[in-house]
């Protein structure tokens, strides 16, 4: 998605070879027009599938899951982060490790909203290690629903997340695939799987 790559080039802040901040337009302050365009892109990629639900994890994936669900004309669910799940709650849950915050937590989805008849698309903002997405995959599996694919806005392709999901037979699409990055420059993988070196703009 060229417009997304251009925004990352112009406004993204590369703090290290693994840390990219996009909080000025994606996951803190949100460019709503861009978010809706992202939803339309995921519709192009997955719209041929009989999707009944879009699912994500709170909080940074919510706007993109909602935009995608609007484009597809289906509901979306966001898995809630909880320290613990009481036995009285009818939920599906899975443990997730956050490498950013270096903590473990449970993500949960009510059994009222996800079941064996559902055909699910997972949407999230980043694909890196894949830990959070694997948690959602496990929840979909626990619910007996069919997982039709995973869509991520930005992928750090130099990390293991994609292979972790594809090794499970999951279709994965990302709108901006980063091959490598360092302060001052970033390499994107384009649709033809070649590398495009893009210099970060001065002052970003």
Which positions does each model-derived feature cover?
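Conserved acidic residues
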Residues: 52, 118, 148
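PRPP-dependent phosphoribosyltransferase catalytic core
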Residues: 6, 18, 137-204
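Short His-Asn-centered micro-motif
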Residues: 57-58, 123-124, 154
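Conserved PRPP/pyrophosphate-binding segment of the phosphoribosyltransferase/PRPP-pathway fold
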Residues: 36-100
């Amino acid at each position: 998605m060229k417009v997304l790559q251009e925004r990352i080039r112009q406004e993204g802040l590369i703090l290290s070879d693994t840390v990219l901040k996009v909080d000025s337009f994606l996951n803190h302050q949100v460019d709503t027009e861009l978010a809706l365009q992202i939803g339309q892109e995921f519709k192009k990629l997955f719209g041929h599938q009989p999707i009944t639900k879009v699912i994500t994890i709170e909080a940074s994936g919510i706007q993109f899951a909602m935009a995608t669900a609007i484009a597809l004309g289906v509901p979306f669910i966001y898995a809630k982060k909880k320290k613990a799940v009481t036995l009285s709650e009818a939920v599906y849950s899975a443990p997730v490790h956050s490498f950013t915050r270096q903590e473990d937590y449970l993500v949960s989805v009510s059994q009222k909203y996800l079941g064996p008849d559902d055909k699910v698309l997972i949407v999230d903002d980043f694909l890196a290690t894949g830990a959070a997405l694997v948690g959602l995959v496990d929840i979909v599996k626990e619910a007996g629903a069919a997982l039709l694919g995973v869509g991520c806005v930005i992928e750090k392709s130099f990390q293991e997340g994609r292979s972790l999901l594809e090794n499970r037979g999951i279709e994965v699409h990302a709108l901006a695939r980063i091959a490598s990055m360092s302060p001052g420059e970033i390499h994107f993988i384009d649709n033809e799987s070649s590398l495009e070196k893009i210099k970060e703009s001065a002052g970003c």
